[in-house]
Amino acid sequence: MQEFTKLTGVAAPMPLVNIDTDMIIPKQFLKTIQRSGLGKNLFDEMRYNPDGSEIPEFVLNQPAYRDAQIIVAGDNFGCGSSREHAPWALLDFGIRCVISTSFADIFYNNCFKNGILPIVMPPEVVEVLMEDARRGANARMTVDLEAQTVTTSDGQSFPFQVDSFRRHCLMNGLDDIGLTLEKAASIDGFERDLATLRPWV
């Protein structure tokens, strides 16, 4: 998993509330177990017309936001079904951070496991960040996980809180497999001791 320490990138404003996982990645794209390739179908029904042409009004189709790495979202982002394809699609598009007033619990947890930082902020702060994001390509926010701050393009800085264990995992690029491998020596030692103490097992 890619490390997350400090990110400076374009922030896309998505004020719509209750963006669910089916909106993030529709069900017809869930047949794959590959994490790559889903970015082209991120927000598919919001990005494309039935004939496959782009909907120009959708934020990620606008030139200023095509390379966005941050989303400033409306309340209750990631609600709906528990599909892990949702963070996969966001990450494959290039999104590394989502800021909202609240997230669905399962989506929130899945983000951390896939290298995305979900940040919960008070409504008044999210509104400031949303307005900054509306400045287009000039809205290059900085998300500093070590300092736990979000800084707008005009220098306003806002603190955020994140669980220390999740922060450690993101900053060191540790998913579940990586965490297990960190303990490989201890696991090997336990297995050797177990074989000596309980050879019949």
Curated annotation (Swiss-Prot):
Designated gene of the protein: leuD
Subunit structure: Heterodimer of LeuC and LeuD.
Entry-linked CDD domains: IPMI_Swivel
SUPFAM superfamilies cross-referenced by the UniProt entry: LeuD/IlvD-like (SSF52016)
Function, as annotated: Catalyzes the isomerization between 2-isopropylmalate and 3-isopropylmalate, via the formation of 2-isopropylmaleate.
Source domain of life: Bacteria
Family statement: Belongs to the LeuD family. LeuD type 1 subfamily.
Keyword field contains Amino-acid biosynthesis: yes
EC number(s) recorded for this UniProt protein: 4.2.1.33
NCBIfam families (alphabetical): leuD, PRK01641.1
Designated name of the protein: 3-isopropylmalate dehydratase small subunit
Gene Ontology terms for molecular function: 3-isopropylmalate dehydratase activity
Pfam families cross-referenced by the UniProt entry: Aconitase_C
GO CC aspect terms: 3-isopropylmalate dehydratase complex
UniProt keyword annotations, A-Z: Amino-acid biosynthesis, Branched-chain amino acid biosynthesis, Leucine biosynthesis, Lyase
Reaction equation(s) it catalyzes: (2R,3S)-3-isopropylmalate = (2S)-2-isopropylmalate
Naturally occurring in which organism (per UniProt): Cereibacter sphaeroides (strain KD131 / KCTC 12085)
GO biological process assignments: L-leucine biosynthetic process
Annotated pathway: Amino-acid biosynthesis; L-leucine biosynthesis; L-leucine from 3-methyl-2-oxobutanoate: step 2/4
